[in-house]
Amino acid sequence: MQVAVIHTAFEDSPRTVASVDVDDNMKVNEALEYAYRWTNNVMGSWSRKEKTFDDGTENGDYNDAVTVMAPLNEGGMGLRSTSMGDQMLLGTTKYKVAMCGFEAI
C-alpha cells in the first residue's frame, strides 16, 4: 500500500513530493501517521536520500520506504516537512493534515 504526500499548505499549486510504502496491515490512521513522520525533517532530511551526510553525521530521517517525487531545492537543500494543510492520498481517499490528525476531504 502507498501513501502519496502532496504539499499544498504553502505552495501556489499542489505538488506531490513523496510516495511512502506502508504495510498493507496498517489501519488508515497508522498509515497516514507513518507517512507524516517520514516526510518530516526531525533528525536530518527525509528527502535527501543519504544515510550519512558529507560531514559523517547520520541522517536520522532516511527511510527506504520513502520515494521522493519532487526535485530538491536549489543547492541540494531538502524539501520542507509535511505540515498542517498538506494532503495525503491513500487509495482513492484524500486526507488533509489537520491540527490534530487527519480529515478526509
Give residue spans per PLM region:
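Short, compact, well-ordered microdomains
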Residues: M77-I105
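Feature targets compositionally biased, intrinsically disordered low-complexity regions
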Residues: M43, D55, N59, E74-M77, ...
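N-terminal non-globular leader segments, chiefly Sec-dependent signal peptides
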Residues: M1-Y62
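Short alpha-helix capping/helix-loop boundary micro-motifs
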Residues: A65-S81
